[in-house]
Amino acid sequence: MIAKDELIEYAMYVNNYYGTPKAYVQEQLAEGKDVILEIEVQGALKVKEKFPDTPLIFITPPTASELKRRLTDRGTESPEVVEERMKTAAKEARFMESYDYIILNERDRLEECVEAVHGVILAEHEKSTRNQAFIDHMKEELKGE
């Protein structure tokens, strides 16, 4: 898929390649659906490069210690993997300013985090740059007034 340019983005994350199929995303957008990609920083920046109007949302725990606590408390990762994930998080944090929105995923407040993401999506729909057809139509209707 990489060689055939069938991915919007791809990157290696924790020693594995991950990517987003271009055809699927294009189909969803053509149907008027919103597409949310859960991807790491490398991939997000590649998407933004190819599609500059794409809003990027960085979702993060409020502190590094909270991130480590969550990774540890899951009990699914070895201490070595947790440390590797923390190093990756430190690298990713260097790019937070490249994102359009930062949303804190507070402990025991998942619903608030989801609502914040939904709010961003709703606001993005209302941007004037996404509503040029309406703007043109309204201006045309008001010409004779």
Task: List each model region and its residues.
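ATP-dependent small-molecule kinase phosphotransfer cores
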Residues: M1-V35, Q42
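Conserved catalytic network of the ASCE P-loop NTPase/AAA+ motor domain
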Residues: E27-A30, K48-P52, A93-M96
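Conserved phosphate-donor/acceptor-positioning beta-strand/loop module used by diverse small-molecule
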Residues: V35-E40, E49-D73
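Alpha-helix capping/helix-boundary segments
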Residues: Q42-G43, R109
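Phosphate- and divalent-cation-binding pockets in alpha/beta enzyme and binding domains
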Residues: K46, E66, E112
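Conserved catalytic-core segment of NTP-binding enzymes
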Residues: P79-R94
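NTP-dependent small-molecule kinase module
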Residues: R94-E145
